[in-house]
Amino acid sequence: RMAARHESDGTDESELPSTLRMQRERKALLAAGAAAFNHKPKDGIAYLAQQALLAPSGRERARSIARFLKDSPLVDKRLLGDYISRAENVDVLAEYMDMFDFGDCDVAEAMRALCEAFRLPGEAQQIARITETFARKYFASKPPGIRSEDAVYVLAYSIIMLNTDLHNPQVTRRMTTADYQRNLRGVNAVSYTHLRAHETREDL
């Protein structure tokens, strides 16, 4: 004889079908929101707001947008990177970055985790915005041997530039170890050989 109440979570079994139905409906709405976002990001966010899937305002709204972008596997990674790095979305970028845990990572590993989540935009200002936010988040985790937030910024930006230099077929003159070390003089450096062997992303 089946119990009237699910032992593990206390859910009334008579309510379970409606709960599952609501979960399916929510999943379908999130998928539709991702599809709309992939067509035009602003439309996707507006759709999610219309469906009451986002907090109404303030930091909670930015966090709910960031959570959607972080959790949805259907969101286009290129559009995601472009969206969070725009000047008008810096609050979403900050909340999105806060959803990563870089505590046990060196800078190169942390950057790799970040760049697996979305594609970096091509515009220098947008890359700088992401790098600044990353540096603030990473330095807040109190990494050993890192002297300042600025050092994280320079190092992270250099990793992006070096990765592009080493793995972009359009670059004819590759950066040497000496070039890389010269660019990072006085900054905590990541091994050139380590970066040469491991791309930050497959097609940065």
Residue spans for each PLM region:
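Extended coiled-coil/helical scaffold and S/T/P-rich low-complexity linker segments
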Residues: R1-S64, T131, K137, V152
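Conserved small/polar residues in nucleotide/adenosyl-binding loops
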Residues: T193-T200
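Short amphipathic alpha-helices and their capping/turn residues within compact interaction modules
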Residues: L53, L74, D101, C105, ...
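Alpha-helical bundle/repeat cores within regulatory domains of eukaryotic proteins
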Residues: A128-N183
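Amphipathic alpha-helical interaction motifs in eukaryotic regulatory proteins
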Residues: I45-Q50, A66, K70, A94-M97, ...
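Internal amphipathic alpha-helical repeat/solenoid segments
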Residues: G58-P73, N89-G103
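Hydrophobic/aromatic-rich, well-ordered segments within soluble, folded domains that form packed cores
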Residues: D43, Y47, L53-L54, D104-L120, ...
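Amphipathic alpha-helical interface segments within eukaryotic helical scaffold
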Residues: L79-S141
